[in-house]
Amino acid sequence: MNKITKYIDALPLSDAEKSALPDTSLQAVHQALDDEHQTFAREDDSPLGSVKARLAHSWPDSLSGDQLVKDDEGRTQLHAMPKARRSSMIPDPWRTNPVGRFWDRLRGRDVTPRYLSRLTQEERESEQKWRTVGTIRRYILLLLTLSQTVVATWYMKTILPYQGWALINPADMVGQNLWISFMQLLPYVLQSGILILFAVLFCWVSAGFWTALMGFLQLLIGRDKYSISASTVGDEPLNPAHRTALIMPICNEDVDRVFAGLRATWESVKATGNAAHFDVYILSDSYNPDICVAEQKAWMELIAEVQGEGQIFYRRRRRRVKRKSGNIDDFCRRWGSQYSYMVVLDADSVMTGECLSSLVRLMEANPNAGIIQSSPRASGMDTLYARCQQFATRVYGPLFTAGLHFWQLGESHYWGHNAIIRVKPFIEHCALAPLPGEGNFAGSILSHDFVEAALMRRAGWGVWIAYDLPGSYEELPPNLLDELKRDRRWCQGNLMNFRLFLVRGMHPVHRAVFLTGVMSYLSAPLWFMFLALSTALQVVHALTEPQYFLQPRQLFPVWPQWRPELAIALFASTMVLLFLPKLLSIILVWCKGPKEYGGFIRVTLSLLLEVLFSVLLAPVRMLFHTVFVVSAFLGWEVVWNSPQRDDDSTPWGEAFMRHGSQLLLGLVWAVGMAWLDLRFLFWLAPIVVSLILSPFVSAISSRATVGLRTKRWKLFLIPEEYSPPQVLKDTDAYLTLNRQRSLDDGFMHAVFNPSFNALATAMATARHRHGHILEIARERHVEQALNETPDKLNRDRRLVLLSDPVTMSRLHYRVWAAPEKYSSWVNAYQQLALNPLALKTK
């Protein structure tokens, strides 16, 4: 079989169609496939003429009549997106310096935004009512939190051993030996630091406690007059004039999982009968060429399988500006004006059609709602770590989400996905300018969701959490290290966002959101400092002689005090604040029926195991988050390159590499405290034991085998596992199907396989006009690539080739026309583990 016959055999044609093709030359084959009989100046451009035929035979059910067009140079182009109608989306520059803004105001240059109300008198009165209620509630929260903190801090002050602050007079220390002065002051300085840190941390814990408590009462009572979900009956027809875009920004994601979830979501939308009101946009920022080709293939298959022509679109950006927020902004500028609403989906998001329809109805019923955030439920993972986290978020999460809604009402959070957004005000007010200045906290905003919610509220639009709306799902990281990688990004983003704390016009609630966002990570180094100062105080107490006389003519000594009854009372109170939300959560499950969680005994046992698991992980997260915060402030780059692995498990080597320093710290800390005072080690045991066990907990909890075993025992069971909704069952089924036909090494297939080459050529984004300099550059790219072995062609160079239809055509032609000349490429392709189902395109 010669090379021409081999090529014809690789075409997606019937035997009769193959036999009708000439076998004299490769150029003749492409000319025979070209119904339009185009002529090309170069022989290796002839595959451009057969792109349409190869696509039509490969994916006949995926193409509509007007999708294949000719670009300005007469090359076949696959229109994967509708015609753009551009809108202006211009960000306002940030003024983060309050002194500069005050000076502008003095000079009459106040640019604080003011927005006209869009509401009727009745709607304004209704809105003012809930805003007033929300303000009163938040003042109550502030009063409760501060009162509790003041009482606890006073208790803490009486517990600390050194009570002689009032007797210390700096004037008496003048001329005194410096070492004596230092030793007199040291215990009190340490105690002051401990007291300040305790107050901050206790206030943080107290706010969480009251949030969970109010969420518990909301869910227990079951009636909420301010719930946005109560504003519709639930069966109103959707307004055909207000269409919704489901947008999914992705970047180098698991293609099989992305398209499985998207297919399940779309089929659920179709089942509601409302599919005509929705379009789907897959917005790719992927820069891995293999994944890019796999995405294109999966998109074509999705369209064929759900008959999604004209409603499911795909776009890969050539310039990845501002990451995810820039991806969404680009959609809004080009196609946003065609839609009233958009629902933002993550790569792992799955939503039911009823949930999506309900979100649209809520937008229709609440004309001043700018963002409505659903409450995603975690499901779909099998590792022990993920199942434990799924159980925790499913049991505890509703309390905190309902509590957030209770305090915030329509001035709430937006989490960046599984939420519906009103497009017009988003375009007008939510464009994000880079943060001014230089350094680690300048540049493009990373945690864009909190900032977009703040800007939407600043413009007068409401931001709501539909905490009681079912049908919204997501997935969690499979293991601790993957979660920490995500936390590294979120830490940087939240620290950057805090620069906006004093920006003009921000609502106090969203200033508080910025504060809580930064405290989510800043609490870790504060907690670590609290433990370090407590340890230092114990060292001082054990190794130095107390200073009984702090004044020259003091009559009575100041004895260090130890009041264990108060210490135990304060410890118990703190434990109540930390663990009562968990108890309230399980009480709620017991009241509403524990059957879906495995029954009364198993759900209770799962709760106890989860508490133990969280105690083991808390110190580990504390140290990692401390490193993240310190590195962000010092401008250090935290490089985290994990080895490739076939599943979600953490190898033992990586576990000890990541947690080895924590294990060593735990051992040194434990031995040192045991040597000083065994009684103090008892109080410190939860910390040091967790650090010593961290590599073992991290590795074992990442095993799916252990997680599946707990699933068989009905531990950490959640309702989505006990009785999976149809959309999740469909996601699993489609994921299995996609895994069977998964495409690996997509770039090599796009070079060699006629079908995938046609697809890559038709969807290539670099549609340049002919030019002499451009031709020289193209020829250089192709020649340099073919003169090297494929493994030496790096990702960026592959992406350049993949983005140009001409270079892909020439690569394809040359490796088939002269296989002996380019044997390194041919041999590399033949050695690939080919998946016959992935190549079965017809």
UniProtKB/Swiss-Prot annotation:
Q: Which GO terms describe its biological process?
A: glucan biosynthetic process
Q: Provide a Gene Ontology MF annotation, just one.
A: hexosyltransferase activity
Membrane topology according to the record: Multi-pass membrane protein
Q: What is its EC number?
A: 2.4.1.-
Q: What class of enzyme is it?
A: transferase
Keyword list, A-Z: Cell inner membrane, Cell membrane, Glycosyltransferase, Membrane, Transferase, Transmembrane, Transmembrane helix
Please name the pathway. Glycan metabolism; osmoregulated periplasmic glucan (OPG) biosynthesis
The source's superkingdom equals Bacteria
Please give the start and end residues of each transmembrane region. Answer: 140-160, 194-214, 513-533, 568-588, 600-620, 622-642, 656-676, 680-700
Compartments (UniProt record):
Cell inner membrane
Check the record and name the SUPFAM superfamilies matching this protein. Nucleotide-diphospho-sugar transferases
Principal place where this protein is found? membrane
- Name one cellular component (GO) term: plasma membrane
| NCBIfam families according to UniProt | PRK05454.1-1, PRK05454.2-1, PRK05454.2-5
Q: What is this protein called?
A: Glucans biosynthesis glucosyltransferase H
The protein's organism comes out as: Klebsiella pneumoniae (strain 342)
The primary gene name is mdoH
